Amino acid sequence: MPPKPSGKGQKKAGKAKGAPSTNKKRKRKRKESYGIYIYKVMKQVHPDTGISSKAMSIMNSFVNDIFERIAAEASRLAHYNKKSTITSREVQTAVRLLLPGELAKHAVSEGTKAVTKYTTSK
């Protein structure tokens, strides 16, 4: 077994001696999530119910997945019709294609309600 070198003769890579020290804290990268919105909707539906962080993570993944599917389908529809803009019509059609039966009807009515509320508030 070779002997361990002593700490005297070794040079360590690092900052130059004349460089000013920057002891500023690094900003943590923000992780975007639908968590607060999922929580608000859950409290509207079931005010006395809580949600674990693992369940919240699953719900967040679900919302991201559905969002990506709707966006991809709406994009495909716009491309088929030689349009360069995704409008509420493409999104509505994408929802009708992706979601089954009654769920699609409810999603379309809620979406229409949200768009109407947004346009009247402007």
Curated annotation (Swiss-Prot):
Keyword Glycoprotein recorded: yes
SUPFAM superfamilies: Histone-fold (SSF47113)
PTM entry text: Monoubiquitination of Lys-117 gives a specific tag for epigenetic transcriptional activation and is also prerequisite for histone H3 'Lys-4' and 'Lys-79' methylation. GlcNAcylation at Ser-109 promotes monoubiquitination of Lys-117. It fluctuates in response to extracellular glucose, and associates with transcribed genes.
GO molecular function, one term: protein heterodimerization activity
Subcellular location: Nucleus; Chromosome
Cellular compartments per GO CC: nucleosome; nucleus
Cross-link Glycyl lysine isopeptide (Lys-Gly) (interchain with G-Cter in ubiquitin): residue positions: 117
Principal cellular location given in the protein's record: nucleus
Record PTM N,N-dimethylproline, positions in chain: 2
Top-rank taxon: Eukaryota
Cross-link (Isoglutamyl lysine isopeptide (Gln-Lys) (interchain with K-5 in histone H4)) at residue(s): 10
Ubl conjugation keyword on record: yes
UniProt function note: Core component of nucleosome. Nucleosomes wrap and compact DNA into chromatin, limiting DNA accessibility to the cellular machineries which require DNA as a template. Histones thereby play a central role in transcription regulation, DNA repair, DNA replication and chromosomal stability. DNA accessibility is regulated via a complex set of post-translational modifications of histones, also called histone code, and nucleosome remodeling.
Similarity comment: family membership: Belongs to the histone H2B family.
Listed name of the protein: Histone H2B
Lineage, opening ranks: Eukaryota, Metazoa, Echinodermata, Eleutherozoa, Asterozoa
